[in-house]
């Protein structure tokens, strides 16, 4: 789920934090990609006849085709992708996982009813909801990426948190995912729709955390509390408080504790034993690999290994796979020049703290002046 309604909140309250980009804008960038999100997107991309791609043995291969060609498209555009895979879910996510299990059961029931009625459109809708990435599909994609020379990171817990950590350490430019909680975990840059199908021509949305905080006049702590009020994967929300009210309350009261002290809890009842403090801690200190333990190396692809795996084992067309590999090699060679602005790089970590540092300096100046606000310059008497 990520953070419920956060993208719209940012669009409403911090529009300058969002840039609409074409993929070529990221030439020379290293990008950490939420692999699980990608695989899910590839698997729900059902073909016109309502089926997924399969090998001769009846194995689903949509995930391999999607990963292979989308990765090559990124390399064509000078992007150096890093795929980050989910580890075990945090204990606090158990409630959200239970809800997902319930929704799957409801979707299975609805699918059966749609098939009995002969409603193909409804059946397709519920089939998409039942798609789940398997362990085997994860392993096959890791094998393919290894053969392509693309670095893979296996997060101990949430992929978005690990991606955010790589961004904060300056190892990559941004996090590519559809889940907005990458910002809550501290990713300075979030890219949505980077892996959207080229044919759909969906523009990439680039969110900048520093601009969000600056324009909304929030600290990082206040932003995390806002995200918890909006709705995250780790705890419930206060009934009756929507996005507009959540923003108002955080701006007025600064944190959830003070919000709870000042709202009418008969009108806005919080969940019983609401673990918002633990959710806050999880966003502040998620379980991630230390960045000095993560080595990102892009290697030459093993063309024959790819052909053996994709064509020999998974029945893809050898001509198409070899043609795509020729294209990939050309793009790799062309992409070695890098970005001009890399010669003038300020690390992502520095960019993220600039706003907070500037605010602290402004507060210090106010204290020196006795908290007085400077007004407009007085006109000189004629």
UniProtKB/Swiss-Prot annotation:
Catalytic activity, EC: 3.1.-.-
SUPFAM superfamilies: 5' to 3' exonuclease, C-terminal subdomain, PIN domain-like
Pfam families reported for this sequence: XPG_I, XPG_N
Annotated region (Disordered), positions in chain: 359-382
Binding of Mg(2+) 1, residues: 34, 86, 158, 160
Residues reported to bind Mg(2+) 2: 179, 181, 233
Post-translational modification comment from the UniProt entry: Phosphorylated. Phosphorylation upon DNA damage induces relocalization to the nuclear plasma.
Skewed-composition ranges (Basic residues): 369-382
GO molecular function, one term: manganese ion binding
Cofactor(s) the record lists: Mg(2+)
Functional summary from the UniProt entry: Structure-specific nuclease with 5'-flap endonuclease and 5'-3' exonuclease activities involved in DNA replication and repair. During DNA replication, cleaves the 5'-overhanging flap structure that is generated by displacement synthesis when DNA polymerase encounters the 5'-end of a downstream Okazaki fragment. It enters the flap from the 5'-end and then tracks to cleave the flap base, leaving a nick for ligation. Also involved in the long patch base excision repair (LP-BER) pathway, by cleaving within the apurinic/apyrimidinic (AP) site-terminated flap.
PANTHER family: FLAP ENDONUCLEASE 1, FLAP ENDONUCLEASE FAMILY MEMBER
Protein name stated in the entry: Flap endonuclease 1
Name of the coding gene: crn-1
